[in-house]
Amino acid sequence: ITFHPDTDYSSFVGAYKPTTALLPICDELGQPMKIGSTVLHKEQIVYEFVAQSFLQAYVNAWKKYDKDDKQYLVIEEINRGNCAQIFGDLFQLLDRNDYGFSDYPIKADADMKRQLQKAFSGLAIEQSDKINAIYEGKDIVSQVLNGDILLLPNNLYIWATMNTSDQSLFPIDSAFKRRWDWTYMPISNAEKHWVIGVNGNNYDWW
């Protein structure tokens, strides 16, 4: 995902969006209308919760946890968005303990809980006892799979890029900064002295 000034929590995590669904046509009593034994249907606008980049990566990380597979969420141009607004209460999840899990789980709201219950339906984590032991024996994994809380697993990596030369539209506060490991990546020493030919003319490049 690439952040920009209009990026917000709903476009990063998820939100209800209008979509069409084929639904039965009902009469005044709410009963499906039929022609013979065939129920009549028509497309109607309904609202569904649509998971966005963060929630997709979060669910995938837990689904592949027992396979020891890593899940990456890459954010481009993180300093072009209002991070405090975009992350919202997910900000707390960025504090990780020595085992790589979130130090402070957060409670999921009702809409998020329904989405997580649907996504985790039938999922079991074989290493649940090991994870629960990190949290003093609390059944934390069951709370995660039931959608009660959000907690980042240690196989979910969130990477972000920013161009320090750009004039940031939204300053990143120190509380947000300290929850990341920062690495400066210099410009790679690309091959120089290229000559590009265009319409019979040669142009020096780099």
Residue ranges and their predicted role:
Residues 1-206:
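C-terminal regulatory/interaction module of P-loop NTP-utilizing enzymes
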